[in-house]
Amino acid sequence: MSSPDIMIVFWGNPLYDGRCVNMINQFRDEKLTVKIIGVGKDNETFDFNGAEIKLINRAMLNSSLTKYFKYFKLIKRILKQESPKTIIASDLYSLIPCAQFKQQQKVKLIYDSREIYTQLAGLVNRPIIQKIWSWYEKKYIYSADYVIANAEIDQEYLKNLYPKISIKIFKNLPGSGFLNAKKIDIRDMLCIDRKTKIILYQGKLHNGRGIRFILTCLKHLGDVALVVVGDGPMKKSYINTARKEDVSDKLFFVDSVPYTDLASFSKSADIGVTIIQPISKSYENALPNKLFEYAVSGLPVICSNLVAMKEMVSIYKCGISIPPTDLNAFIEAFNTINKNENNFKIGINLQKELLWENQNKQLIQLIK
């Protein structure tokens, strides 16, 4: 069995992750052999665009006390079997076993710090757990030949923490599928009236994503529906908020869909939203992939006026940024876009510029 050129290790299902999917497609276009280790509902191995994806059953990792140690052990065992030439650790949890493996075998290691993992929203009010993950990152980040970040603000933050790391920026941009996707009739699928405007949120349903705030705004917007595409622990809370605000008839859910299908939903809405609340440093620095996915799909955007997001919509003139808890600002932004939506839709040349394939070509140079 020959060693793969690249192995991507990811604490999640890579088929539902745009960054993993886009990396796979980019590497396969270069005729590189690619294998991916992820976490899913079952133990299974299958092909995706010529790459082999191996999923670990998440039921094996359901103990809060032991799941990460089991994950570390499984990853190191697989890496030893596969002996890849280059490893991309797609999160902090994957960096640890990959760095430990590198101590035993010569291999190129790239740490994809797509978020500030030691400052995640889930670590707010959990200082001991936060210190543990910070210790792990500090211990192993220098094992990486390169660290890659999603935005300049993250690059600066990490460079201040770890001055000697070699860090590059590769933004969370959509693949070309978002440019050429077939449009799903979401109104027909969800029985939404043709005259109803659709606000779209796609992504994980976690605290601090601004969904409850948007639900509060909905009752002031007239004939408007919010379609949420994704899964997560906050779903029940959103349903309760909708009931409390008397907008249950305006809230629609679609379960998570594979990344390759996501563009079809983006094409079918009227406005895309990502009102991230600054409840952690990771959220303060956020430059979410959905922001670019909306823009490339032709959707005007309403987003938080956090540094990276505000800069993005200002540069590309694809939407309006607002204070993330300002109800009147959201309503005004919605009305402004609704009256002049073409002013906030970027042209085809700019859409092409914002594709992963066109902006992240240098990633191949890190691999070779």
Named regions from a protein language model:
Residues M7-V9, I148, D193-L218, V227:
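Conserved donor-binding/catalytic core segment of Leloir-type glycosyltransferases
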Residues N25, F72-K80, I96, Q100-Q104, ...:
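Membrane-proximal helix-turn-helix segments that form the acceptor-binding/catalytic region
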Residues G38, Q130, S134-A181, I192, ...:
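Donor nucleotide-sugar binding/catalytic pocket of nucleotide-sugar-dependent glycosyltransferases
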Residues T66-K70, K108, Y117-Y140, E156, ...:
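Nucleotide-sugar donor phosphate/pyrophosphate-binding loop at the beta->alpha transition
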Residues V229, K236-S264:
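Nucleotide-activated donor-binding/catalytic signature segment of Leloir-type glycosyltransferases, i.e.
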Residues I271-T274, E293-C303:
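Short hydrophobic beta-strand element within catalytic cores of glycosyltransferases
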Residues I315-Y316, I320-L327, F334-E341:
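Conserved acidic donor-binding segment of nucleotide-sugar-dependent glycosyltransferases
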Residues K339-I367:
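A charged, aromatic-enriched C-terminal amphipathic alpha-helix characteristic of glycosyltransferases
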